[in-house]
Amino acid sequence: MNGRYVGYVAGHDPLHDFLTRIIRDHMGVREPQPAYRVFRLSGSNEVYAYEEKFSAAKIICKFYGSRFGWDRDKAAWMARQEYEGLETLRRYNLIGSPHHVIRPLGISRDINGVLAVEFYSGEGFSHAIARATRHRDDAHLYWRLKALAYFLATQHNRTANGAGVDFEPDCRYFDTVVGRLEQADRIGQWDIDELSWLRDCWRDRPRMWQDRQVWLHGDATPANFLFGHGMDVAAIDLERMKRGDRMFDVGRVAGELQHAFMSAVGDWHRAEPFIGHFLWEYSCHFPDRQRTFESITARAPYYMALNLLRIARNDYIGRDYGGRLVARAKKLLRAA
């Protein structure tokens, strides 16, 4: 079990009964005196893994409570939203091999707004990227990107609803990110004016409005995908799931790849073969691969830039590197 071991769940803790109901009702485990080991998982949210000592049954719990100042109703609403998002995607037969959306197992308003989901054993996307950036294991990352492209193309194609995309919300999100960069004193007024002008240039391009809406993962970062055997991929953490342009997901993956190589080896060019491979593999799941590839590569720079700006706003990003991210984002936005 990954994560830092922090002890056992006390028998009188309401969480103990919550976990026991889940392993009994969803896993068929009827241990008379269950005991749960607790592991704190890394990440920005309060996420813990629980392993029942005798049966080895595993559950992941995500707690929303502390994020909202202990507003139980808000926390419960967020937990319910993610629960329903997981159920929604699973109804499109994204279950099992090779495409899997993790199964939600339960929620509780009164236990810190907890959402319980199944445990999926697999390699994290971030680990696959690190094998390439740190150990030059490029073949492994190429294989994982092929699998991820297959997963996302399947999710997007199965969930397309025929309605046209609305690019305006992605422009508003761009403004939100730029505003946070300004608040963090990462950019000045000249940068804001230039970024706003570039945003308007993209808004005026018909291609940004011409695709069909799909269900998006909404936070397609390396932390939120796990790889199993062969082409198996599992998606986790769907709290930001929404309808929109498929490029919001695809471009975020591409932007994360560029960031990974910029931060690890100092060279955005090293990411280009992987980004191209990912976009090409995504395109192969459409009737006209070449036309699809041309369409998504024409839109990708906006969403890649948006992701680099999103990363640059974070406190853990050094000021010099944040400046490089902003500069790279501008170059992407200037693309034809």
Describe the predicted segments one by one.
Residues 88-95, 123-166, 205:
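Conserved kinase catalytic-core helix
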Residues 1-39, 54-56, 313-336:
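Regulatory N- and C-terminal appendages and interdomain linkers associated
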Residues 249-287, 304-321:
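Active-site activation/catalytic loop segments of kinase-like enzymes and analogous catalytic loops
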Residues 98-113:
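Short beta-strand micro-motifs within the conserved protein kinase catalytic domain, predominantly
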Residues 37-61, 202-248:
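Active-site acidic catalytic loop and adjacent metal/ATP-binding pocket
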Residues 49-81, 137:
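ATP-binding glycine-rich loop module of kinase domains
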Residues 14-32, 160-217:
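An alpha-helical support segment within catalytic cores of ATP-dependent transferases
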Residues 111-124:
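Conserved short submotifs of the Hanks-type protein kinase catalytic core
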